[in-house]
Amino acid sequence: IQSDWGGTRIEAWMTVSAARKVLPNILESDPVYDEQNRTARLYNAMICPLTNFTARGFLWYQGEANRGFDGYARYMQELASLWRGRWGDAEMPFYFVQLAPYTYDDAEGLSLPLTVEQQTQALDLIPFSGMASTTDAGSEYTIHPPYKIRVGERLALLALKRTYGYGALIAQSPRYESVRFEAGRAIVRFRTDGIMGPQWK
């Protein structure tokens, strides 16, 4: 079941009460936003009608409209909790897509890496979650990753391994743990190894 609306904010996909756990003063009808971006609008119109259907899990691909907000990881946590509650299963898988590389128009160029950092933090906040990395699937010239098959395959690998029991698959992407510098070199340690695009193998 696909429910989507391009260019929307995460607040639109959750209840006002869930959003206020992160941002207590958020408005239900903020005139700054387009109609579809107001808090709970898409949740009421495009998620609630689906809750009588059986679902195995969720795939979430959003974030551009919330770039640079340092509460985004908490928003994701509340969104996953809300949706799981509506389906009555606190362990429903929640797999999401990392924002792909792209040259945004913010002067300092920090909104993308800060949002990716928030998405990475969400992995630790949301149990039974996973992130499909797009570091090698994007382009600085287009906001939509040109290697869409790669993105879809990585989401599928997460679901096959973690939800459907194909334990031998490699599904996670490399995840940074720490770095140290010595003798003019940077030695990077990863928490996990995993799948990478062909140019990195």
Say what each PLM segment does:
Residues 1-201:
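Cell-envelope and extracellular/periplasmic
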